[in-house]
A protein has these predicted regions:
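Hydrolase active-site cap/lid region
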Residues: 30-40, 167-220
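Glycine-rich nucleophile elbow surrounding the catalytic serine of serine-hydrolase chemistry
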Residues: 157-167
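Short beta-strand element of the alpha/beta-hydrolase
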Residues: 75-84
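Conserved alpha/beta-hydrolase "acid-adjacent" motif
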Residues: 251-260
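Catalytic nucleophile-loop/oxyanion-hole region of alpha/beta-hydrolase
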Residues: 54-55, 90-99, 110-152
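N-terminal cap/lid segment of alpha/beta-hydrolase-fold proteins
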Residues: 29-73
Length: 268
């Protein structure tokens, strides 16, 4: 009996120690991985240009982060963050920590806003793609005014932003050459049957309504347009490398989404 009690005490002590150490680690790291990339920003690291305009009809802007001491006689490289939020929420400020981190490593970085579906405007993926492309044009013009030549870029994003980053990388419309793309938990194929949860969030009562919202078109056959806005369907032989990350569980993005993209890559 005494031996059993002693064993139980060891178990209790172990559990308490584990819980305390976990809480200490959480308090030290905060929201990982974002806490791990936090940068104490100052003029020695770079300069931030806030709320810069680019061509769009809805007043969207971008923020630009320029590292200190860049050599204007050499080619420079751009990383663009596109925020997530199920295409109906989020803002360019969501990318601040990432932009500061990559700027501290010597990359010109930017984070952009785009038209959201909750704003009650024409907010199709086609429009968002065009806005992202126009933002890149504005960034190129702005950095050239500053005396920098951006020779290549990598778009990145989370969830919805990852989709727009992939579309920018795969469709060949970026004025700055895209060398690779990286994203986390991004939709890759907008097959309506996969998106019942998003339809519920957006209060859509039919697959046709979903397709109309995503494409901005009121037509009967959406197959071609759904493919035209889906990264997995626009990957081709000229694809750039992609670094992708998906969780084992996701309350929003269906787990099969990564396989659509992987299968598309395996075709070429």
């Amino acid at each position: 009996m005494r031996k059993r009690t002693k064993k139980q005490m060891y178990v209790i002590v172990f559990v308490i120690t584990f819980v305390i150490s976990t809480l200490i680690r959480i308090s030290l790291l905060g929201s990982a991985p974002e806490r791990l990339i936090q940068v104490i920003w100052n003029d020695d690291i770079g300069k931030i240009y806030k709320n810069l305009d680019y061509e769009n009809a809805n007043g969207n802007q971008y923020d630009l982060y320029v590292p200190a001491g860049l050599d204007k006689s050499k080619n420079q490289y751009l990383i663009v963050f596109i925020h997530g939020g199920s295409f109906n929420s989020g803002s360019k400020e969501d990318g601040e920590a990432w932009c500061k981190y990559y700027a501290s490593k010597g990359y010109v970085t930017a984070s952009l806003d785009y038209t959201l579906q909750k704003q009650g405007k024409d907010a199709s993926i086609y429009l968002m793609n065009t806005e992202a492309e126009n933002a890149i044009k504005a960034i190129k013009e702005k950095t050239e005014e500053m005396g920098y030549h951006i020779s290549a870029m990598a778009p990145c994003g989370v969830s919805a932003g990852g989709t727009l980053a992939m579309n920018l990388a795969y469709n060949g419309n970026s004025i700055i050459p895209v060398k690779f793309v990286f994203q986390m938990s991004a939709p890759t194929y907008f097959k309506p049957s996969e998106w019942s949860l998003l339809m519920k969030v957006d209060k859509l009562d039919s697959e046709k309504a979903f397709c109309q919202m995503m494409t901005g078109k009121d037509i009967d056959n959406y197959n071609d347009d759904i493919k035209a806005i889906s990264p997995a369907c626009i990957v081709n032989k000229n694809r750039v490398p992609s670094l992708i990350g998906y969780g084992l569980k996701d309350h929003c993005v269906p787990l099969d989404q990564k396989y659509y993209l992987m299968d598309a890559y395996n075709m070429y």
